[in-house]
Amino acid sequence: MQKFPLKKGLSSAQELHDEINNYIDVLMGHINPPIADGVDTLFEVSSTYLARAKEIEIKLLERERNAKVESGDELKKFRTGELRSFIELCKSAQNQGSRRITVALSELNLKEN
């Protein structure tokens, strides 16, 4: 269960490109995230975006398995290009968010002792 809703399913390569670009703008700090969850924000947002990216990837792989898809197909190029890079960005942001939480918990433990 995610803390905020996202689009679901597949659309055109251009619409998926626009969706992913919006998420990239959030992760890069160009626009505000959809939630403000303190130190957990980066982790929660990147985890949600990663889940959406993997959903898109799964749907695209199902499409390729069920139909003959040419190598020049726009959705296939999206999956092997932008989507793959976005998944890596989400994983990096998720790791950074996890480290921020760890540091915050360590600081809290030091204050309590």
What is the predicted function of each stretch?
Residues 1-113:
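Extended, charged interaction scaffolds in large complex subunits
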